[in-house]
């Protein structure tokens, strides 16, 4: 008996158009039912209050479109910037994931100061990522660390260090091939 595989494609619809109606129209035309949402109507998803996130979810549900992941800016701040406000945004992002009924949140490991050795910031990166990973586990979401140019995890060795420390049911990796060649 031949085995049949079903593959669900997902993408960033805000690259189609910033307006949610147009994103939905094109996704439906392409037969896609999943999107990794970064933004809708010209605004980042994590910038919306939860009541507006619920309206976005209703609009997606009406069109049989679901999130594969919250495409967040979490961890895309300088490592030298205060973390507390960003952690509040992270907690809000976890709430958004619950409203959107998706366990996955794409995140990053903080921009490094230009010209400085990223290992100088190892302890602070790990403190911050560890705090988020602990929160993710307590709130049953899965963080997906993406390699990204100019962040701590912008090379394979440091991505490996992050995975060795944090890999769990609530912390995984997303690999963007282009980010290692930029």
Please give the residue ranges for each predicted region.
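Short N-terminal helix-initiation segments at or just after the protein's N-terminus
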Residues: 3-13, 115-121, 180
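Acidic/histidine-rich catalytic cores of soluble enzymes
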Residues: 5, 9, 34-37, 70, ...
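Aromatic/hydrophobic pocket-lining residues that form the small-molecule binding cavity
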Residues: 20, 53, 86-90, 122-125, ...
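Gly/Pro-rich active-site loop or hairpin
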Residues: 24, 46-49, 81, 116-119, ...
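Active-site groove signature of glycoside hydrolases
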Residues: 97-118, 139-149
């Amino acid at each position: 008996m031949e085995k049949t595989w079903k593959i669900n494609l997902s993408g960033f619809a805000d690259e189609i158009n910033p307006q949610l109606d147009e994103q939905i129209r094109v996704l439906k035309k392409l037969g896609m039912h999943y999107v990794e949402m970064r933004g809708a109507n010209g605004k980042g998803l994590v910038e919306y209050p939860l009541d507006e996130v619920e309206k976005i979810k209703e609009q997606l549900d009406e069109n049989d479109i679901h999130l594969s992941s919250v495409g967040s800016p979490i961890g895309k701040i300088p490592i030298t910037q205060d973390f507390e406000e960003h952690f509040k945004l992270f907690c809000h992002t976890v709430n958004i994931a619950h409203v959107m009924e998706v366990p996955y949140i794409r995140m990053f490991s903080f921009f490094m100061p230009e010209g400085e050795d990223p290992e100088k910031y190892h302890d602070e990166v790990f403190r911050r990522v560890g705090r988020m990973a602990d929160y993710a586990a307590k709130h049953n979401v899965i963080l997906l660390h993406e390699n990204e140019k100019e962040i701590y995890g912008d090379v394979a060795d440091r991505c490996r260090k992050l995975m060795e420390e944090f890999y769990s049911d609530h912390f995984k990796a997303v690999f963007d091939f282009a980010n290692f060649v930029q």
